[in-house]
Amino acid sequence: TFLNNQKRYKRYFKNYGLVFNGETNCYPDKDLAVAYPHQDKKYKYLNAGMCMGRTDFIMETFPKLKEHFTDYEKNWSEQGVWTNIFFDYLKKYGDDNPITLDYDCKIFQCLWDEEWGRSANFDIVYNKNKIYNKLTKTEPCVFHTPGPTCSDSQVWKIINNKYHITNRSEDFYEYI
């Protein structure tokens, strides 16, 4: 779902070839969690469900994607494959990695929160026009409900004030 201004990509990520959604769940290989850069960030793991990038870079990367998928036993998940490519580029380019994550939810907001569970991300404040992340102090323009158990129907209810909350927290509505 798109909210806000889609031109943010150029403003925040013009020096990168590809930007992935950052999330709180290190999936599918939890052993890689300690290898990710920016350990101080909450949204530090790659989520392949949302990405934006330059067409030339993406087209150049597709053969690498195909190479990784040749071993299905090892690489059965597109998120795992993109994670491997991310780490390949990180090893090769270091801080100049052309692939990055949206660590501060400037564009993408993943609704999954590993700390609280599926669709229960308490960093987010919803209103009819925007979502606001209190932790990162950003207004992401795209939100993503990953996996089969994370539902945007709950988000729709909140945004449209159809979620019957009997004990409304001031904190929940402070940004509305």
List the predicted regions and their residue ranges:
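Short C-terminal domain-edge/linker segments immediately following a structured domain
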Residues: 23-26, 54, 82-84, 173-176
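Catalytic core and acceptor-binding pocket of nucleotide-sugar-dependent glycosyltransferases
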Residues: 43-157
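GT-A fold catalytic core of metal-dependent nucleotide-sugar glycosyltransferases
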Residues: 1-28, 49-52
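Juxtamembrane luminal stem/stalk of type II transmembrane Golgi/ER carbohydrate-processing enzymes
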Residues: 151-176
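Structural alpha-beta junctions
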Residues: 13-19, 88-100, 165-170
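Short, flexible, basic/aromatic active-site loop/helix in glycosyltransferases
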Residues: 30-41
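Short acidic/His/Gly/Ser-rich catalytic and metal-binding motifs that mark active-site loops
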Residues: 28-31, 62
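Hydrophobic transmembrane signal anchors and adjacent membrane-proximal interface regions, especially
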Residues: 11, 122-124, 133, 163-165, ...
